[in-house]
């Protein structure tokens, strides 16, 4: 049995779509039962249950990293859904669980030579927080800050979900 929690931050809905596609892939690949939950960071638990086998954390890349209050405010002025907090703040509040596999992902605009990644920053912050098995996962591309998701990325996210499910079911996380 595999239980997965996917925590995401999504301002324009792009990262939510990616998180849902990853979850669909994991559900499609799981023959042993279990549960794959997708929750917005505003509703995410600050204690990860012992029944969770894999934690995925994803968010948009804003200002070369995870969002901050100012970048979220800027996005809201462009029509984004306002969030109480972002992945950065959630990581600062969540109780670490030693030994839990954690994989991060992000969405971002493909701009040549643009440094920084929310997935990299989140993995580093999670390790610093005490999640010793946190690793950077995938980046998924959006056409513009507001989206949409680049064609083919939802399918790639679903396929990545299938691959992650295989890793977990074989004990290689």
PLM feature spans:
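Short phosphate-binding/catalytic loops that engage adenosine nucleotides
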Residues: 31-34, 131-132
